[in-house]
Swiss-Prot record:
Listed InterPro entries: Aldolase_TIM, His_biosynth, Isoase_HisA-like, Isoase_HisA-like_bact, RibuloseP-bd_barrel
Annotated compartments: Cytoplasm
Taxonomic source organism: Pseudoalteromonas translucida (strain TAC 125)
The protein's name in its UniProt record: 1-(5-phosphoribosyl)-5-[(5-phosphoribosylamino)methylideneamino] imidazole-4-carboxamide isomerase
Major enzyme class: isomerase
Lineage: Bacteria, Pseudomonadati, Pseudomonadota, Gammaproteobacteria, Alteromonadales
Length: 242
């Protein structure tokens, strides 16, 4: 599945390079119109991130994002600044099909477990951003500044055992770079657990990348910068996955 992604900062569509806020690049597109364009192009799902809320939950842009998603006729998943049960509830009530949980899923596992038990595992995407280390893939949190005490596969097992099947994994070194995805990361994940649906994110720059990810058995391919920069269209990406 092709999943177009939009990151929002200061109520505008942006991209970051390797997650660093000082590298922000603003795009002159209106959020609601861009989402509609992606949906009309045949995307089966959309991905939204509130970068303001991710950095500072007191500055959430949820009103702006919810106004833009109101008329959407395709499912969407949303992340950024989701810190408590009420946040999960608010997004699901606003029409999100799934909430994307990142740092909290690494640092507050028992709390996230309680949310999953309350709202249902099908409403969650666990987002694990990793660095390659000598011992394997190490998840990092808080804008990728803090390394986790748990390994990637350990966290996947924890949430898979709770019934979660959607995992969004990003190799931090690839994010926003358009230098090709981290095929090794996705191979390791699929080899470890073939029942989960892995969403690949970061580095996708060509239709060939998409083709290779599909051949690996990836469940979803998140496309941000490549679509915004016009490397290819949603329709072209979909054609490669058919």
């Amino acid at each position: 599945m092709i999943i177009p992604a939009l990151d929002v900062l200061q109520n505008q569509i942006v991209r970051l390079y390797q997650g660093k806020y000082e590298t922000v690049q603003f795009y002159p597109f209106e959020l609601g119109a861009r989402l509609k364009e992606y949906a009309d192009s045949g995307a089966g799902k959309l991905h939204l991130v509130d970068l303001e809320g991710a950095r500072d939950p007191s500055k959430k842009q949820w009103q702006h994002i919810q106004a833009a998603t109101k008329a959407l006729n395709v499912p969407y998943q949303v992340g950024g600044g989701i810190r408590c049960e009420q946040d999960v509830s608010d997004w699901l009530k606003a029409g999100a099909n799934q909430v994307v949980i990142g740092s909290m899923a690494v640092e507050k596992r028992e709390q996230v477990k309680a949310w999953i038990e309350q709202f249902g595992a099908e409403h969650f995407v666990i987002a694990l951003d990793v660095n390659k280390t000598a011992t394997g893939w190490a998840p990092a949190t808080h804008g990728w500044l803090t390394e986790s005490e748990f390994g990637l596969l350990e966290l996947v097992d924890f949430y898979a055992n709770l019934g979660v099947i959607d995992f969004l994994c990003t190799d931090i070194s690839k994010d926003g770079t358009m230098t090709g995805p981290s095929f090794a990361l996705y191979e390791d994940l699929i080899k470890h657990n073939s029942t989960i649906k892995v969403q690949a994110s970061g580095g996708v720059s060509s239709l060939d990348d998409i083709k290779k990810l599909k051949e690996l058995g990836i469940g979803g391919i998140i496309l941000g910068k490549s679509l915004l920069d016009g490397a290819f269209s949603v329709e072209e990406a979909l054609a490669v996955t058919r």
